[in-house]
Amino acid sequence: MMNGRPGHEPLKFLPDEARSLPPPKLNDPRLVYMGLLGYCTGLMDNMLRMRPVMRAGLHRQLLFVTSFVFAGYFYLKRQNYLYAVKDHDMFGYIKLHPEDFPEKEKKTYAEILEPFHPVR
């Protein structure tokens, strides 16, 4: 994706620069979804092995939930890092080429919306 960047290391999942970014929140909906996906994976595992779906292997279901949340946490950290790099490059380009991005004139809501005439 970003192979042309200087200093790019090909087989590194999360570079050291990602440590400066704030960590994802633990109640992020995407992490909750990953935990739910892990729980459903545990249920599917029980179903495929013909065990009682909800009651058998609760420790395995907990293991699936924690491992999916753990993997999702680092996936979110990587996604946030890639978005930060993209934003940094984009804003750097905007700073270097201001003639391509002229300032728009500010309009008030009165100029945008139609006048309001109440009907009685």
From Swiss-Prot:
The keyword Electron transport is assigned to this record: yes
Membrane topology: Single-pass membrane protein
Key words of the record: Electron transport, Membrane, Mitochondrion, Mitochondrion inner membrane, Respiratory chain, Transmembrane, Transmembrane helix, Transport
Intracellular or extracellular location(s): Mitochondrion inner membrane
Domain of life: Eukaryota
Family, per entry: Belongs to the complex I NDUFC2 subunit family.
Record's subunit section: Complex I is composed of 45 different subunits. Interacts with TMEM242.
Identification of the protein by name: NADH dehydrogenase [ubiquinone] 1 subunit C2
The species this protein was found in: Mus musculus (Mouse)
